[in-house]
Amino acid sequence: MAKQIQAIRGMNDILPTQSPLWQKVEAVLRSSVSAYGYSEIRTPIVENTDLFKRSIGEVTDIVEKEMYTFADNNGDSLTLRPEGTASTVRAGNENGLLYNQEQRLWYMGPMFRHERPQKGRYRQFNQFGVEVYGIGTADIDAEVLMLSARLWEKLGISDHVSLELNTLGDPAERAVYRDALIAFLEQHKDALDEDSKRRMYSNPLRVLDSKDQNVQAILAGAPELMDFLGEESKTHFSQLRELLDAVGIKYTINPRLVRGLDYYNRTVFEWVTSSLGSQGTVLAGGRYDGLVAQLGGKDTPAVGFAMGLERIVLLLETLELNKDIPSEVDVYVTAMGDSCLVEAIKIAQELRSALPNLKVMSHCGGGNVKKQMKRADKSGASVALLIGEDELAEGMVTVKHLRNDIEQQRVARSALGAFLAELAIK
């Protein structure tokens, strides 16, 4: 026997038993962004490597360690996209969507990062994101946070997530703070871990996000960015908080929240959960007003967020909120003998036409009644339709209930659609 080929480490299959939960999550995401009037954008999986170096930042973990980069046959450096925002900006600039325009966009698709696979974190993962361009005021920051809160409500996990909020100010304010932070870190350099020492000069704000407990103890005395903000940044953040208070969205201000990508300014936020252990962040985002110009467009304010679907699915499974997923099959149609096969197939087609939301599976492959009923039960269907010679002669169909103790019934073929609709099989 030939050796089986396995999936690449950290790149997982989503199997038929898992797909219904994924479909539920995706349906909630689509309906939620639709309710806010957002439009879908789809971008290529492969982009020029420079796109991510210029947007994410050359001294970030993603660019330094995690990107899947390769040279094509022309010698061009290409990269599997590690996140969705840079591609969305590139597409907007290239296709004239952003200049002097407002755009509310969303995307969903696979991303790739070569990091150590662990629960809820994979090398290929599915990301959903929202991006808004052309609006620089705090009300749109509030809107994307309201939208994110709506997702949790519709998924039934509002009580299991909490919002952390911060502001990074504008680039000039952050530059002054950066110098102050470096000066502070230099006083404690010998006590820092190696990762923080490496970042101290190249990307000092990322030291604030260190997971090392000793570093966090040192940072308790560090200067806070909030003290370096100008009036405009303070007003923006104050207006955002007022709007969130007005609509009842609770939050905690986290002065250590800086996000892992270089392009953020002013508002940054994360929705976190305590139900997934160390992988606590389930959605993150913020404002990135300089990114469009950084990638060749005009100065354009922008704000958005992204979430990994694997973590949302894992959270739903952890909280055991995946139990009410409907079966992929509502009705299983059987033929009691070869002479009944054609009519059984026709009945299945009639039901699909009359009741478009009904999920109808036809038995194929023959077999006796016992075999067909075993397949019907395994399919997860609520009822099986038995079509034999007696039923055909009388214009009837036998309905066998598979999930409760109701006795099987004979129903006129002409009334079958109405009967199944009355059973509330949807």
From Swiss-Prot:
Its EC number is 6.1.1.21. Its main location: cytoplasm. It catalyses: tRNA(His) + L-histidine + ATP = L-histidyl-tRNA(His) + AMP + diphosphate + H(+). The keyword ATP-binding applies. InterPro entries: aa-tRNA-synth_II (IPR006195), aa-tRNA-synth_II/BPL/LPL (IPR045864), Anticodon-bd (IPR004154), Anticodon-bd_dom_sf (IPR036621), His-tRNA-ligase (IPR015807), HisRS-like_core (IPR041715), HisRS/HisZ (IPR004516), HisRS_anticodon (IPR033656). CDD domains: HisRS-like_core, HisRS_anticodon. Keywords: Aminoacyl-tRNA synthetase, ATP-binding, Cytoplasm, Ligase, Nucleotide-binding, Protein biosynthesis. NCBIfam families: hisS. Belongs to the class-II aminoacyl-tRNA synthetase family. This is Histidine--tRNA ligase. It comes from Shewanella baltica (strain OS155 / ATCC BAA-1091).
